[in-house]
Curated annotation (Swiss-Prot):
Annotated gene: ATG26
Domain PH: 238-336
Listed name of the protein: Sterol 3-beta-glucosyltransferase
Glycoprotein as UniProt keyword: no
Compartments where located: Cytoplasm; Membrane
SUPFAM superfamilies noted in UniProt: PH domain-like, UDP-Glycosyltransferase/glycogen phosphorylase
Binding site for UDP-alpha-D-glucose: 749-750, 752, 1025, 1053-1054, 1056, 1069, 1072-1074, 1093-1094
Phosphoserine: residues bearing it: 76, 693
C-alpha cells in the first residue's frame, strides 16, 4: 500500500480552529474569543510555587494512582522542621524576573506578538494583514544577521525536495549469515528427523513458514527429503508490549486502560503504576481469533481491533491505525506461542518423491513465495500445501535445488510425483486451511492434538483456526487420490515438539504433548458460588496444600484432603489464568484494606501472592509476584478483634490484610517469610525489582526494528506478523541497509544540549549519521564526543540578559523585548531552515522549545519527533511545567494549563512563523489545529519512576528514561577534592553537595553566608559549586564573597556521575538532568526551585518521598532540610529503591527503540500536515534528484 494511503481519515479533514477556555470544565474556546485578552493577565496569577499535599496527582478520578508519598516520618511537617516557613526570608530570591528558557520564550513571544495591549482581543492566528503590520513595527531591528545570511544563501528560497509519494518504495533485503553445519549439528538433525547415516545434507536455506504468523526457520535438502526446522520463540517472563487502549462495551461507550501483554496474558489496569490489580485479564490460550476491523466502504484498516474467545468478543480502540496494527501483530505472535507453549520447535519432513508441485511467485521486491504441494501419505492420499517465504531471493535456488535432486531420483529409478501427476486444484494456503497430517514416529500414542492457528494468505483476512493433530492413518478426512503403484511412498511429517535435546543440548525442556480434548472441556467451567463453604469462611482457618516448596507435616490439621487438592489447584489457575507451573501452598479468608475493606480470599503460591474478592458486586483481583515483595510484618488491627499483616513492596505502597484470627495471620506471615528467604537465597543479587510498566519492545531495539519492518511490509499489503527464529546456531539481527541522517535540534543551556549528545552517540552506534544543531558556544562540547555540529542563531543568553537587567515591567521593557525578540526569532527561523535544507536530513528530532522543527519537516516531508525533559503533552495527570499551581487543583486544571500555554506560545510567534512559511518554506499559513502538535511522536527523557506515563497519554508518547552522558571515565578529580572527601569519611561526617547553577540573586554575599551557617549548624561537610551572582554573566560568580570554613570546599563544576556517588545528599535547583543524576545515585535530594520546570521536579521528588522541596532558602530552612536529608533512614531507603529502578532503565536504548517503533507513524503525520499544494514550478523531477534523495531505505536481517 502506498504510504500516501496510510492517513487517518480524521487527520486528513480540516477542522475548527484550536480552542481555549478559562473554565476548567470546558477547556475549549477559540483564540479569537473576546475572553482571549485575559490570558496574559491570568498568567500572572499562576504562582511559580506549588505547595505539597499527601494526595496523589489527580486525574479527576480515584483510578489514577501515582507513586505514593513517603511515610510521615520521611515527610516531616513543614512547620515542625521550619524549612518551609512562610514567614522566613528567602535569600535565594531572584533579583530580577528569572525565567526558564521556554518561559522566556513564552513571555517574550507574548510581548512580540502583542505589541499593543489594546489589540490583544482582535489578533488572529493566521491573519496576514495584522502580522505584516506588526512586522513593520521595527522592521530593520535585529535583522542584520539574517540579511547577510540571505545574501550568501545559494539555495532557492523554496525547497526542492521529493514528495513522499514520489520517492521509491522501501527495499527489503533479508539475509541470514550462514554457518556450515557442524558434524554435531548434522548428527542431531539426523536423530531429529530419523534419517539414515548414508543420507547426506545437500543444501540449507533461511526461510519463513507462513501460518497466522510468519515463522522464521531453515530449510534443509537431503538426497531423499525436504526438511524444515524452526525454533519457536521462548516465552520469557517479560513484557512484550504495553500502552494505553480504549475498551468499548455496550453499557459504557469507552474506557481507557493501561494494557500489558506478558506471556500468555493480556491484562488491563487503571494506570501504569497500579500493576498488581488487573481490571481484566484475557488468556490468549483461549483466544480463537484476532483481527483488525476494516472500513466498510474502502476496506482500509481502522483504529479498532477485536479479540474473539468462546464466551466473549472484546473490542479495543487504539490511538492510531499504526498502533492498532502493532497490537494485533504482537497479540497474534503471543497467541501462537501461548497455544504452543509446551513445544519449542516446529519440524517438517517431506519425502522428495511425495512432492507434486513447486510454484514460486515474487511478492515484494526480492521477496519470493514458494508453494510446495505434497502427497500427505500412502494411506489417505490427501494433498497438503505448504507456503514458504524467502526475503533474500533464495526461493528460486530452493526450487532449482529440488528440481535437480528430483531429476537425479528419477534417473536412479525412483518413482516421483513431480512430473507424473499434473497439478490439480486443491485447498491451498491461499484459500481455506487444509488440515495436515502430523506424525511423530518416536511416540506410539495416537489421537494427539496440537492447536496451531493457521492462515494462508499474506493479507488482513484471517482464516478459521484449524487443529494439527497426531491421528491414525486409517482416518479418511481428506480427498483420496488414485492409489499409486509405488508402495514405498513415505508420509509427510509435520512435527511440533520440544527439540531442545535433539538440536541444542544447552536448552533444556521436556517433550510434552497434551491430550486431545474438546475446546469446551479444556476450560473447566467453574461457577464460583459465594454461598458455598460458609463454615470455612466463618472459621477463617488456614488451608494448606501439599507442595515441594514449603513441606507440611502429615498430621497438619490444616492440610487439605488429597482428593480436593487437584481441583483446588485447577480453580486457582482458572481464576488467575495461570499455567501449570503455579501450585498452591496455602489460602486464607481475609479483608484487603485499600480505600475500603474488601472481603475475599488470599492465595499463596510458589512465587505469587493473589487475592480475589468474594462479595457480590465486587471484582477485585490482585496478582503480586513475590520478587516484588521486600518483607511482611504483623501489625495491630484497624478494628477490634482483627489482626493485620502488612506486605511491603519495592517502590509501592504497603498492602494491609485484616484477618479475623491471629492463627491465620501468623501462619501466612511465616510462610511468606520462608518463601522470600528462598527467593533471596536463589538469587545472587537478592530480589529483582520488576518493572512491568515498560514493555520489552520499548527496551529491545531488535524488537523495535522488527516492528518497523512489519510496518513497512504491511504498507505493501503483506499483513502478517513475523516470528524470529531463536536458533542458537544462526544469530538473527536486523539493521538498515541505509544509514539514516538524524538532525537533533535544540536551543537553551548545556542541560538542554547534553541529553541530545547522549542520544546522538547511541544513534551513531546503531550505524546512523547524527548532526546536532544548536548554539555556537556548544561546538567544542558536541564535537568532543565525535558528533557533527551545525550552528544556528537565536542564542537565548541575549534575551535572558534583557530580562534580568530590567527590574520591573514597564513600557520601555516591552518595546525593547519586542524588538529584540523579533530579530532573535527571525534569525532562529532562517538559520535553522538553512541548515536542515542543506543537510537533507532523513529524520529530525527537536526540542519543542525551538519552535521551528515542525514547520521544517513539513517542508522537507521527513519524519518528525519531539524530545523534552518536562511535561509538554496535554494530560490531566500533570500541570504544564511552567504553570505549576501552588497546590494540586485536579485534572481539569492540569489539562487547562497545557491548552493555555499552547495558545499563548503560538499567539506570540504565529505572525512571524506564517510569514516565514510562505516566503521561505513555500508552505501555506497554518494554525494550531493544522499543525497537529498533539499527534507528533514525543520522547520524554525522564525516568518513568519520576514521571510515570499518564493513562491519557497517546500511544506515541513515550517516557523513555534519562539520557545520561557518562563522563566519569575521562574525569580526573583534583587532589584537593579527594583529600576533602577522605577527611569527611575519616571523621564520620555526612558529605553533601550544594549547587544551584548560574542564577541571579538579590544579594550573593548574603546567600553565601546563609549557606555557610546552615552547613555549620547541620554539622556536615559540603562540596560547593558556587555559580550564583548579582548579574548574569558575572565572571566573579564562581568566587565566594566570604571566607569558607574547613568543612566547605568550593570546587566548581564536577561531573555529577562521578561526584554524586561520593556524597550522602544533594541540594540543587531541580533541573531535570541534575535531578536525574542525584536520584540515579540514590541521594536524598533537597530542591530549591527558581523557575520553570524546577518547581515541577521539586514537587515530584517530594511526592515520591526521596527529598524536600524548599519554598524559601535561608540559614534555618536549609539547615533543617540538611538534617532531614542526611539522617532520615526512610528517605534514604526509598532513594535507594529509586536508584535500583533507574539503574535497570536504559533511556537511550528505549528512545532508539521508540524511534524505530514510531517511524512510519511519524512519516504519516508529516504527510497529513501537507495541506497546501505546491506551485507547478516547485514540482521536482524525479530524474533530477540527488543520490541521497533516491537512495532506497532497506533493512537487512543478519
Amino acid at each position: 500500500m502506498p504510504i500516501t494511503q496510510i492517513i487517518s481519515a480524521s487527520d486528513s479533514e480540516a477542522g475548527p480552529k484550536p480552542s481555549i477556555s478559562l473554565v476548567p470544565d470546558k477547556p475549549s474556546e477559540p483564540e479569537t474569543s473576546p475572553r482571549h485578552h485575559r490570558l496574559s493577565r491570568s498568567l500572572s496569577k499562576f504562582k511559580r510555587w506549588r505547595g505539597r499535599s499527601n494526595s496523589s496527582l489527580s486525574m479527576g478520578s480515584s483510578e489514577q494512582q501515582e507513586l505514593q508519598d513517603s511515610p510521615n516520618e520521611a515527610r516531616s511537617d513543614d512547620d515542625e522542621n521550619g524549612y518551609n516557613n512562610d514567614n522566613a526570608d528567602d535569600l535565594a530570591k531572584s533579583k530580577y524576573m528569572m525565567k526558564s528558557i521556554a518561559g522566556l520564550l513564552t513571555t517574550a513571544s507574548v510581548y512580540a506578538g502583542m505589541n499593543n495591549a489594546q489589540e490583544m482581543n482582535v489578533l488572529s492566528q493566521v491573519d496576514s494583514e495584522e502580522s505584516d503590520s506588526s512586522d513593520s513595527f521595527q522592521e530593520n531591528i535585529g535583522r542584520n544577521e539574517v540579511k547577510s545570511k540571505k545574501e550568501n544563501l545559494k539555495t532557492k528560497s523554496h525547497p526542492e525536495v521529493p514528495r513522499l509519494d514520489k520517492r521509491k518504495p522501501t527495499l527489503f533485503d533479508f539475509s541470514i549469515t550462514r554457518e556450515k553445519l557442524s558434524k554435531d549439528n548434522v548428527a542431531k538433525l539426523r536423530q531429529r528427523f530419523c534419517l539414515d547415516e548414508q543420507e547426506p545434507f545437500l543444501n540449507d536455506f533461511p526461510a519463513w513458514l507462513l501460518k497466522d504468523v510468519l515463522v522464521q526457520g531453515h530449510i534443509f535438502i537431503t538426497t531423499k527429503h525436504f526438511l524444515f526446522f524452526a525454533y519457536l520463540p521462548k516465552n520469557p517472563r517479560s513484557v512484550k508490549m504495553s500502552g494505553n487502549l480504549n475498551i468499548r462495551t455496550k453499557l459504557i461507550r469507552s474506557t481507557r486502560y493501561w494494557c500489558v501483554l506478558k506471556n500468555h496474558l493480556f491484562s488491563m489496569y487503571t494506570s501504569s503504576t497500579e500493576l498488581y490489580f488487573p481490571v481484566l485479564t484475557i488468556d490468549l490460550r483461549e483466544v480463537q481469533k484476532i483481527e483488525t476491523q476494516k472500513h466498510t466502504l474502502n476496506g482500509s484498516a481502522t483504529k479498532t481491533f477485536k479479540l474473539y474467545t468462546d464466551e466473549s468478543t472484546f473490542k479495543f480502540n487504539a490511538d492510531s491505525e499504526f498502533s492498532a496494527k502493532s497490537w494485533v501483530n504482537a497479540l497474534k505472535k503471543e497467541q501462537f506461542a501461548a497455544q504452543n507453549s509446551e513445544n519449542n520447535s516446529i519440524s517438517l519432513k517431506i519425502p522428495l518423491p511425495n512432492i507434486i508441485e513447486i510454484d514460486d511467485q515474487p511478492i515484494v521486491n526480492k521477496a519470493l513465495t514458494l508453494r510446495l504441494r505434497a502427497l500427505e501419505s500412502s494411506q489417505t492420499y490427501a494433498i497438503d500445501d505448504f507456503m514458504f517465504v524467502f526475503m533474500d531471493g533464495s526461493g528460486s535456488q530452493v526450487k532449482e535445488s529440488l528440481g535437480e535432486q528430483l531429476a537425479i531420483l528419477q534417473k536412479s529409478g525412483v518413482n516421483t510425483l513431480y512430473y507424473d501427476i499434473p497439478a490439480k486444484k486443491s485447498k491451498s494456503s491461499f484459500g481455506k486451511e487444509t488440515p495436515a497430517t502430523v506424525e511423530q514416529k518416536n511416540n506410539g500414542e495416537d489421537s494427539k492434538y496440537l492447536n496451531v492457528p493457521t492462515s494462508a494468505v499474506p493479507s488482513s483476512e484471517n482464516g478459521k483456526k484449524s487443529r494439527f493433530r497426531f491421528r491414525e492413518r486409517s482416518n479418511s478426512w481428506f480427498r483420496r487420490a488414485k492409489p499409486l503403484e509405488d508402495s514405498q511412498v513415505e508420509d509427510v511429517e509435520e512435527i511440533y515438539k520440544d527439540a531442545a535435546n535433539d538440536i541444542d543440548s544447552s536448552v533444556h525442556s521436556t517433550i510434552h504433548i497434551h491430550e486431545q480434548e474438546d475446546s469446551q472441556e479444556q476450560t473447566v467451567a467453574w461457577k464460583p458460588s459465594h454461598l458455598k463453604n460458609f463454615a470455612e469462611m466463618w472459621a477463617a482457618k488456614p488451608i494448606h496444600y501439599r507442595n515441594k516448596f514449603i513441606p507440611f507435616q502429615k498430621d497438619d490439621t490444616y492440610l487439605i484432603k488429597e482428593t480436593e487438592e487437584v481441583s483446588a489447584n485447577e480453580r486457582f489457575r482458572y481464576h488467575f489464568k495461570f499455567n501449570k507451573e503455579k501450585s498452591l501452598i496455602s489460602t486464607y479468608y481475609t479483608y484487603l484494606n485499600r480505600n475500603v475493606p474488601v472481603y475475599g480470599k488470599i492465595y499463596v503460591s510458589n512465587d505469587t501472592v493473589c487475592f480475589r474478592s468474594l462479595l457480590p458486586g465486587s471484582n477485585t483481583y490482585m496478582v503480586l509476584p513475590l520478587v516484588d515483595v521486600e518483607t511482611c510484618y504483623k501489625e495491630k488491627g484497624f478494628r477490634f478483634g482483627y489482626f493485620v499483616l502488612v506486605i511491603v513492596i519495592h517502590g509501592h505502597e504497603e498492602l494491609f490484610f485484616e484477618f479475623s484470627t491471629e492463627v491465620a495471620r501468623d501462619d501466612i506471615e511465616r510462610i511468606l517469610l520462608k518463601l522470600l528467604d528462598n527467593i533471596y537465597a536463589s538469587s545472587a543479587e537478592g530480589s529483582n525489582i520488576s518493572s512491568a510498566s515498560l514493555g520489552d519492545v520499548q527496551h529491545n531495539p531488535d524488537s523495535a526494528k522488527l516492528k518497523l519492518f512489519e510496518d513497512k511490509i504491511n504498507a505493501e499489503g503483506f499483513e502478517v506478523p513475523l516470528m524470529i527464529d531463536e536458533n542458537p546456531h544462526y544469530k538473527t539481527s536486523i539493521k538498515p541497509n541505509k544509514s539514516y541522517k538524524f538532525g537533533l535540534l535544540t536551543i537553551g543551556s548545556r542541560g538542554d544540549v547534553q541529553p541530545y549528545i547522549a542520544l546522538g552517540k547511541g544513534l551513531i552506534k546503531e550505524g546512523h549519521q547524527v548532526v546536532i544543531i544548536t548554539h555556537s558556544e556548544f561546538r567544542d562540547f558536541v564535537e568532543s564526543h565525535g558528533i557533527q555540529f551545525e550552528e544556528i542563531a537565536g542564542n537565548p543568553v541575549e534575551l535572558m540578559s534583557l530580562m534580568v537587567e530590567n527590574e520591573s515591567m514597564n513600557v520601555k521593557m516591552l518595546r525593547e523585548a519586542s524588538s529584540k525578540f523579533r530579530g532573535w526569532i527571525d534569525a532562529l527561523l532562517q538559520t535553522s531552515w538553512e541548515v536542515c535544507n542543506r543537510r537533507k536530513f532523513d529524520i529530525l528530532i527537536e526540542s519543542p522549545s525551538a519552535m521551528v522543527g515542525i514547520h521544517i519537516t513539513e517542508a522537507l516531508q521527513i519524519p518528525y519527533f519531539r524530545a523534552f525533559t518536562m511535561p509538554w503533552t496535554r494530560t490531566r495527570a500533570y500541570p504544564h511545567a511552567f504553570i505549576v499551581p501552588d497546590q494540586k487543583r485536579g485534572g481539569n486544571y492540569n489539562y487547562l494549563t497545557h491548552v493555555l500555554f499552547e495558545n499563548v506560545f503560538w499567539k506570540g510567534i504565529s505572525g512571524q512563523v506564517n510569514k516565514w512559511r510562505v516566503e521561505t518554506l513555500g508552505l501555506g499559513k497554518t494554525n494550531l489545529f493544522l499543525l497537529q502538535q498533539n499527534n507528533v511522536p514525543f520522547l520524554y527523557n525522564v525516568s518513568p519512576t519520576i514521571f510515570p506515563p499518564s493513562i491519557d497519554f497517546s500511544e506515541w508518547v513515550r517516557v523513555t528514561g534519562y539520557w545520561f552522558l557518562d563522563d566519569k571515565s575521562t574525569f580526573k578529580p583534583p587532589a584537593e577534592l579527594q583529600e576533602f572527601i577522605s577527611e569527611a569519611r575519616s571523621k564520620g561526617k555526612k558529605l553533601v553537595y550544594i549547587g544551584f547553577g548560574s542564577i541571579v540573586v538579590s544579594n550573593a554575599k548574603e546567600m553565601t553566608e546563609a549557606l555557610v551557617e546552615a552547613v555549620m549548624e547541620a554539622d556536615v561537610y559540603c562540596i560547593l559549586n558556587k555559580g550564583w551572582s548579582e548579574r548574569l554573566g558575572d565572571k566573579a560568580a564562581k568566587k565566594t564573597e566570604v571566607d569558607l570554613p574547613r568543612n566547605i570546599l568550593n570546587i566548581g563544576n564536577v561531573p555529577h556521575d562521578w561526584l554524586f556517588p561520593q556524597v550522602d545528599a544533594a541540594v540543587h535547583h531541580g533541573g531535570s538532568g541534575t535531578t536525574g543524576a542525584s536520584l540515579r545515585a540514590g541521594l536524598p535530594t533537597v530542591i530549591k526551585p527558581f523557575f520553570g520546570d524546577q518547581f515541577f521536579y521539586a514537587g515530584r521528588v517530594e511526592d515520591i518521598g526521596v527529598g524536600i522541596a524548599l519554598k524559601k532558602l535561608n540559614a534555618q530552612t536549609l539547615a533543617d532540610a540538611l538534617k532531614v536529608a542526611t539522617t532520615n533512614k526512610i528517605m534514604k531507603d526509598r532513594a535507594g529503591l529509586i536508584k535500583k529502578k533507574i539503574s535497570k532503565e536504559d533511556g537511550i536504548k528505549t528512545a532508539i527503540s521508540a524511534i524505530y517503533n514510531e517511524l512510519e507513524y511519524a512519516r504519516s503525520v508529516t504527510l497529513s500536515r501537507v495541506k497546501t499544494p505546491r506551485k507547478k514550478e516547485e514540482n521536482v523531477d524525479a530524474t533530477k534528484l540527488t543520490p541521497a534523495e533516491t537512495t532506497d531505505e532497506g533493512w537487512t536481517m543478519i
